[in-house]
Amino acid sequence: MSVLPTPLANQLLIALPALSDPTFSRSVALICQHDENGAMGVLVNRPSEYTLGEVLSQMGIDTDDEPLREQVVLSGGPVHPERGFVIHDDAREWDSSLEVGQGVFLTTSRDILEAMAAGNGPRNALVALGCAGWGAGQLEFELGENSWLTAPSDANVLFATALEDRWQTAAGRIGVDLFRLTDYSGHA
Protein backbone atom coordinates (compact mmCIF):
# COMPACT_ATOMS: atom_id res chain seq x y z
CA MET A 1 0.00 0.00 0.00
CA SER A 2 1.38 3.42 -0.92
CA VAL A 3 0.74 6.54 1.08
CA LEU A 4 -0.11 9.63 -0.91
CA PRO A 5 1.48 12.89 0.14
CA THR A 6 -0.64 15.72 1.42
CA PRO A 7 -1.91 17.55 -1.66
CA LEU A 8 -0.11 20.84 -2.21
CA ALA A 9 -2.90 22.69 -4.05
CA ASN A 10 -3.13 26.30 -2.87
CA GLN A 11 0.48 26.25 -1.68
CA LEU A 12 3.27 28.47 -2.92
CA LEU A 13 6.23 26.53 -4.24
CA ILE A 14 9.39 28.58 -3.64
CA ALA A 15 12.63 27.71 -5.44
CA LEU A 16 15.60 27.29 -3.13
CA PRO A 17 18.89 28.96 -4.16
CA ALA A 18 20.37 25.59 -5.22
CA LEU A 19 17.76 25.19 -7.98
CA SER A 20 19.81 26.18 -11.02
CA ASP A 21 17.34 25.45 -13.84
CA PRO A 22 16.92 28.92 -15.42
CA THR A 23 13.18 28.36 -15.91
CA PHE A 24 12.64 27.88 -12.19
CA SER A 25 15.58 29.62 -10.51
CA ARG A 26 14.24 32.08 -7.88
CA SER A 27 10.68 31.31 -8.96
CA VAL A 28 7.44 31.18 -7.01
CA ALA A 29 4.63 28.96 -8.30
CA LEU A 30 1.06 28.71 -7.10
CA ILE A 31 0.21 25.00 -7.09
CA CYS A 32 -3.27 24.75 -8.60
CA GLN A 33 -3.72 20.97 -8.77
CA HIS A 34 -1.85 18.13 -7.09
CA ASP A 35 -2.74 14.46 -6.85
CA GLU A 36 -1.23 11.02 -7.44
CA ASN A 37 -1.00 11.77 -11.18
CA GLY A 38 1.18 14.86 -10.78
CA ALA A 39 0.92 18.57 -10.20
CA MET A 40 0.16 21.73 -12.12
CA GLY A 41 1.03 25.28 -11.12
CA VAL A 42 1.58 28.77 -12.46
CA LEU A 43 4.73 30.81 -11.90
CA VAL A 44 3.67 34.09 -10.30
CA ASN A 45 6.88 36.11 -10.37
CA ARG A 46 8.16 35.82 -13.94
CA PRO A 47 7.23 38.68 -16.29
CA SER A 48 6.80 37.81 -19.94
CA GLU A 49 7.56 40.12 -22.83
CA TYR A 50 3.84 40.84 -23.30
CA THR A 51 1.36 43.28 -21.83
CA LEU A 52 -2.27 42.39 -21.29
CA GLY A 53 -3.20 44.96 -23.93
CA GLU A 54 -1.17 43.05 -26.53
CA VAL A 55 -2.77 39.74 -25.56
CA LEU A 56 -6.28 41.19 -25.57
CA SER A 57 -5.65 42.78 -28.97
CA GLN A 58 -4.46 39.44 -30.41
CA MET A 59 -7.70 37.91 -29.12
CA GLY A 60 -9.85 40.65 -30.65
CA ILE A 61 -10.91 42.01 -27.24
CA ASP A 62 -11.01 45.81 -26.97
CA THR A 63 -10.60 47.88 -23.83
CA ASP A 64 -10.08 51.54 -23.04
CA ASP A 65 -8.69 50.74 -19.57
CA GLU A 66 -5.08 51.92 -19.90
CA PRO A 67 -3.82 50.46 -16.58
CA LEU A 68 -5.29 47.09 -17.61
CA ARG A 69 -3.67 47.35 -21.05
CA GLU A 70 -0.29 48.06 -19.42
CA GLN A 71 -0.51 45.14 -16.96
CA VAL A 72 2.40 42.75 -17.42
CA VAL A 73 1.45 39.23 -18.45
CA LEU A 74 3.39 36.60 -16.53
CA SER A 75 5.37 33.73 -17.98
CA GLY A 76 3.52 31.00 -16.10
CA GLY A 77 5.82 28.14 -17.07
CA PRO A 78 7.12 26.08 -19.99
CA VAL A 79 3.99 23.93 -20.50
CA HIS A 80 1.35 25.22 -22.95
CA PRO A 81 3.02 28.65 -23.40
CA GLU A 82 0.28 29.62 -25.87
CA ARG A 83 -2.52 29.17 -23.29
CA GLY A 84 -3.74 31.83 -20.90
CA PHE A 85 -4.23 31.23 -17.18
CA VAL A 86 -5.90 33.79 -14.91
CA ILE A 87 -5.36 33.55 -11.15
CA HIS A 88 -7.96 35.66 -9.37
CA ASP A 89 -10.23 36.19 -6.37
CA ASP A 90 -13.66 36.23 -8.05
CA ALA A 91 -16.01 33.34 -7.17
CA ARG A 92 -18.39 33.96 -10.09
CA GLU A 93 -18.98 31.05 -12.42
CA TRP A 94 -16.71 31.33 -15.44
CA ASP A 95 -16.80 28.93 -18.41
CA SER A 96 -13.66 27.07 -17.30
CA SER A 97 -12.65 27.67 -13.71
CA LEU A 98 -11.17 25.79 -10.76
CA GLU A 99 -11.15 26.78 -7.11
CA VAL A 100 -7.50 26.42 -6.10
CA GLY A 101 -8.17 27.24 -2.46
CA GLN A 102 -10.32 29.42 -0.30
CA GLY A 103 -10.86 32.60 -2.31
CA VAL A 104 -8.30 31.79 -5.03
CA PHE A 105 -9.39 30.61 -8.47
CA LEU A 106 -7.78 29.62 -11.77
CA THR A 107 -9.71 30.37 -14.95
CA THR A 108 -8.69 29.48 -18.49
CA SER A 109 -11.70 30.72 -20.46
CA ARG A 110 -12.07 33.82 -22.61
CA ASP A 111 -15.08 35.14 -20.66
CA ILE A 112 -12.96 36.34 -17.74
CA LEU A 113 -10.72 38.38 -20.06
CA GLU A 114 -13.79 39.90 -21.71
CA ALA A 115 -15.16 40.83 -18.28
CA MET A 116 -11.82 42.38 -17.30
CA ALA A 117 -11.73 44.41 -20.53
CA ALA A 118 -15.29 45.64 -19.88
CA GLY A 119 -14.40 46.74 -16.34
CA ASN A 120 -16.38 43.91 -14.76
CA GLY A 121 -13.59 41.47 -13.93
CA PRO A 122 -12.12 40.26 -10.66
CA ARG A 123 -10.86 42.80 -8.16
CA ASN A 124 -7.47 41.07 -8.19
CA ALA A 125 -6.12 39.05 -11.12
CA LEU A 126 -2.85 37.80 -12.56
CA VAL A 127 -2.72 36.75 -16.20
CA ALA A 128 -0.07 34.25 -17.29
CA LEU A 129 0.86 32.48 -20.48
CA GLY A 130 1.86 28.88 -19.87
CA CYS A 131 2.03 26.80 -16.73
CA ALA A 132 4.36 24.39 -14.97
CA GLY A 133 3.70 20.67 -14.74
CA TRP A 134 5.16 17.77 -12.79
CA GLY A 135 4.56 14.10 -13.55
CA ALA A 136 3.50 11.54 -10.96
CA GLY A 137 5.95 11.68 -8.06
CA GLN A 138 8.19 14.28 -9.72
CA LEU A 139 7.31 17.18 -7.42
CA GLU A 140 7.66 14.97 -4.35
CA PHE A 141 11.11 13.92 -5.57
CA GLU A 142 12.16 17.54 -6.14
CA LEU A 143 10.94 18.48 -2.66
CA GLY A 144 13.01 15.61 -1.24
CA GLU A 145 16.03 16.89 -3.16
CA ASN A 146 15.67 20.29 -1.44
CA SER A 147 14.83 22.15 -4.65
CA TRP A 148 11.72 23.79 -3.21
CA LEU A 149 10.09 25.15 -0.07
CA THR A 150 6.32 25.27 0.36
CA ALA A 151 4.29 27.98 2.06
CA PRO A 152 0.55 28.59 2.32
CA SER A 153 -0.83 30.70 -0.50
CA ASP A 154 -1.30 34.34 0.40
CA ALA A 155 -3.36 36.96 -1.45
CA ASN A 156 -0.87 39.65 -0.45
CA VAL A 157 2.00 37.77 -2.11
CA LEU A 158 -0.08 37.00 -5.21
CA PHE A 159 -1.78 40.33 -5.77
CA ALA A 160 -0.05 43.11 -3.79
CA THR A 161 3.67 42.28 -3.75
CA ALA A 162 5.92 43.49 -6.59
CA LEU A 163 7.04 40.68 -8.92
CA GLU A 164 10.71 41.12 -8.00
CA ASP A 165 9.90 40.80 -4.26
CA ARG A 166 7.61 37.74 -4.37
CA TRP A 167 10.39 35.15 -4.03
CA GLN A 168 11.76 36.50 -0.75
CA THR A 169 8.35 37.64 0.56
CA ALA A 170 6.81 34.18 0.03
CA ALA A 171 9.68 32.52 1.92
CA GLY A 172 9.53 35.17 4.62
CA ARG A 173 5.97 34.08 5.39
CA ILE A 174 7.42 30.89 6.87
CA GLY A 175 10.40 32.61 8.50
CA VAL A 176 13.00 31.85 5.83
CA ASP A 177 15.47 34.44 4.54
CA LEU A 178 16.52 33.01 1.18
CA PHE A 179 19.49 35.36 0.98
CA ARG A 180 21.01 33.65 4.04
CA LEU A 181 20.83 30.15 2.57
CA THR A 182 23.68 28.43 0.76
CA ASP A 183 23.23 27.23 -2.78
CA TYR A 184 23.95 23.60 -1.91
CA SER A 185 22.34 21.07 0.38
CA GLY A 186 23.22 17.74 1.89
CA HIS A 187 21.45 14.70 3.23
CA ALA A 188 22.16 12.91 6.49
Curated annotation (Swiss-Prot):
Full protein name: UPF0301 protein XCV3063
Pfam family, one: DUF179
Disulphide-bonded residues: none
Signal peptide bounds: none
Tree of life domain: Bacteria
Entry's family note: Belongs to the UPF0301 (AlgH) family.
HAMAP family from the UniProt entry: UPF0301
Annotated Gene3D superfamilies: VC0467-like
InterPro entries per UniProt: AlgH-like
Species of provenance: Xanthomonas euvesicatoria pv. vesicatoria (strain 85-10) (Xanthomonas campestris pv. vesicatoria)
GO cellular component: cytosol
